[in-house]
């Protein structure tokens, strides 16, 4: 299921500052995280859907790379994103 336009703009504004700032790593991670949670719910209902599982693994990999970049560039922004999205315990 794709994100609604309003919800996507809300995430972009929250993590990027403006609704046009979609390139920030924080925005990318937040959007990936939302899509990952949607796909996780889908896969719990449809465990044999291998194509969606591959898509989920690709999204997790993209999020991991974006978080690694953010950690190397700005550790304070990385910690803030982790806290806001509850990604690490």
UniProtKB/Swiss-Prot annotation:
The family database entries (InterPro entries) matched by this protein are listed as: Ribosomal_uS15, Ribosomal_uS15_bac-type, uS15_NS1_RNA-bd_sf
Q: Which UniProt keywords apply?
A: Ribonucleoprotein, Ribosomal protein, RNA-binding, rRNA-binding
What biological-process GO terms show up in the record? translation
So where does this one cross the membrane?
Answer: none
* Keyword GTP-binding part of the UniProt annotation: no
Give the molecular function GO annotations. rRNA binding; structural constituent of ribosome
Q: Name one GO cellular component term.
A: cytosolic small ribosomal subunit
Cytoplasm listed as a keyword: no
Q: Which Pfam families match?
A: Ribosomal_S15
Show the PANTHER family listed in the entry: RIBOSOMAL PROTEIN S15, BACTERIAL AND ORGANELLAR, SMALL RIBOSOMAL SUBUNIT PROTEIN US15M
Q: State the family it belongs to.
A: Belongs to the universal ribosomal protein uS15 family.
What does the UniProt record say this protein does? Answer: One of the primary rRNA binding proteins, it binds directly to 16S rRNA where it helps nucleate assembly of the platform of the 30S subunit by binding and bridging several RNA helices of the 16S rRNA. Forms an intersubunit bridge (bridge B4) with the 23S rRNA of the 50S subunit in the ribosome.
Q: How does it assemble?
A: Part of the 30S ribosomal subunit. Forms a bridge to the 50S subunit in the 70S ribosome, contacting the 23S rRNA.
Q: Name it.
A: Small ribosomal subunit protein uS15
